[in-house]
Swiss-Prot record:
Residues 87-98 have a biased composition (Low complexity). InterPro entries: DUF4678 (IPR031460). Residues 53-65 have a biased composition (Polar residues). The gene is TEX44. This is Testis-expressed protein 44. Testis. Detected in germ cells at all stages of the seminiferous epithelium, strong expression in elongating spermatids (at protein level). Residues 192-207 have a biased composition (Basic and acidic residues). It comes from Homo sapiens (Human).
């Protein structure tokens, strides 16, 4: 794009003269080009004007870049040709300071990026923009770095104000409650306390309602007083000079009642109980006393002892032992009967043994005698016929 009043060839020649050898022509300092375009004086010595404008514009470019960006290289005063100026774009790898800021406050990170983007607008090609636009763009970075740090502080102040507002509101509620400006809950509590004070629940007609604002010690004292009134109401003091009578059945403590004997009797009759009662008392009925239970326990161990206690007219155990009875005997009588039985058994056993031996001997004797007789008969019967045959004149 050629500017009016300037030939395209002159601009290219000036760029080739200003740029150092070995560098591409697209990396010529843009601030010098902007000032060269803004100068409306046509002269033939283009190089001298370009160098003078670059020297005057170098401090302005350094001030617009700010103290944070150190990437721009300031040309030395001894050199005529400027060094390479890199564009002020945000780096792809953020520094540790930027990472920590982004972790702590994302809003501050975005504002820093916006400020860097606005500062990088200066490096756009100057030959495509007019004089007024470039001057406006150059003036914007001068105000942006100043306003950028103030934005996080304002945001932090607003955040602190929002965080402090609930605390202040709670403190206001507490202060209002202390000054008497209660909330709806305090009003409802006061209203319910007033209703309870209007409709008390007393244990007896003479009791009075306790105020709601009394301490626990005062409430305990009132309860003790009310109990004393109760005791006076139920048990009036006796007249002077008279002995206080014992309390009747109706003048008993609350929660107690006299014993009922019907609770300790059998609720239903049992066949076993009826049979045992009929054996002992000669009649049918249920349990009536503890003696029946004791008698039953003895009858279960031995019916004879229980019958002896009930049927005999003796009053002591010694009488029962010395009395004549089939089952009740003294210890000596029992020992004598045992000894007599033993002796009688021994004697009878011995006599029976002797009788048995005698019987055995008798049988042996009888058999022996019979054997001798049979032998004599045999001899006599055999010897006599032979002698008769030997002596025929024996007759």
């Amino acid at each position: 794009m050629a500017l009016p009043g300037y030939p395209l060839g002159n601009v290219d020649d000036s760029r080739s003269k200003d740029s150092p050898a070995g560098e591409p022509q697209g990396q010529v300092p843009l601030t010098a080009d902007v000032l060269a375009v803004s100068s409306s004086v046509a002269s033939t010595d283009w190089q001298d004007i370009d160098q003078a404008s670059f020297k005057t514009a170098t401090p302005r470019a350094i001030s617009t870049s700010g103290d944070k960006d150190k990437s721009a290289v300031v040309p030395e005063h001894g050199q005529k040709t400027p060094r390479k100026i890199t564009p002020l774009l945000p780096s792809q790898n953020p520094s540790p300071l930027q990472v920590s800021m982004s972790l702590q406050n994302p809003a501050w990170d975005r504002q820093v990026q916006d400020a860097r983007t606005s500062q990088s607008l200066v490096v756009f090609p100057s030959h495509l923009l007019g004089k007024d636009k470039m001057s406006q763009m150059a003036s914007v970075p001068e105000r942006e770095p100043e306003s950028a740090p103030s934005a996080p502080s304002a945001e932090l102040q607003s955040t602190q104000h929002m965080e402090a507002q609930p605390v202040e509101s709670d403190a206001d509620h507490v202060t209002a409650g202390a000054n008497g400006q209660h909330g709806p809950q305090a009003a409802s509590t006061t209203k319910s306390a007033e209703e309870k004070a209007e409709h008390p629940k007393a244990p007896h007609p003479e009791a009075e309602a306790l105020p709601s604002d009394e301490s626990p010690v005062a409430m305990g004292a009132n309860v003790v007083d009310s109990l004393g009134d109760l005791q006076t109401w139920f048990f009036p003091p006796p007249p002077a000079g008279s002995v206080s009578p014992s309390p009747g059945p109706h003048e008993v403590a609350l929660g107690r009642r006299p014993l009922d004997s019907s609770l300790y009797t059998a609720s239903e009759e049992n066949s076993y109980m009826r049979s045992m009662t009929s054996l002992l008392d000669r009649g049918e009925g249920s349990i009536s006393s503890l003696a029946d239970i004791l008698v039953w326990s003895e009858t279960t161990m031995g019916m004879a002892i229980a019958t002896g206690f009930l049927d005999s007219g003796h009053s002591t155990v010694a009488d029962l032992l010395h009395s004549s009875g089939p089952s009740l005997r003294s210890v000596p009588s029992l020992v004598g009967s045992v000894s007599s039985a033993f002796s009688s058994g021994l004697v009878s056993g011995t006599s029976s043994a002797l009788r048995t031996i005698t019987r055995v001997l008798e049988t042996v004797e009888q058999r022996t005698v019979e054997g001798i007789r049979s032998a004599m008969r045999y001899l006599t019967s055999h010897l006599t016929p032979r002698q008769a045959q030997a002596d025929p004149n024996y007759d």
